Amino acid sequence: MGLFPSLTQEIAIDLGTANTIITSNGRIVVDQPSIIAIDTRTEKLVAIGEEARKMHERTHDRIKTIRPLKDGVIADFRAAELMIRGMIKMIPKRRGSLFKPTLKMVIGILPT
């Protein structure tokens, strides 16, 4: 935690094969399935997390769902980036915060 905890927002992201969890100042603020849906014609993001999970194997031919992580490792970097960016946007804005969020990252190098 920073010098003025009420003015800062620290974010931690746990990328999991099944779910991605984002915490802000020690509290879970995002807990979503690790999946995205993209439009195959435009390559644009259509849905993230729970919304994308609901589309999995039930959508139009143009919509493809992707699970960016496999066996605990990033299998599709572009999809992982889209998912992370989208989930960061899901974080509720902290009232009174004067500074941009600080991202805390832990990278595991051993299988769990």
Regions found by a protein language model. Name each.
Residues 1-112:
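Nucleotide/phosphate-binding catalytic cleft detector across ATP-hydrolyzing
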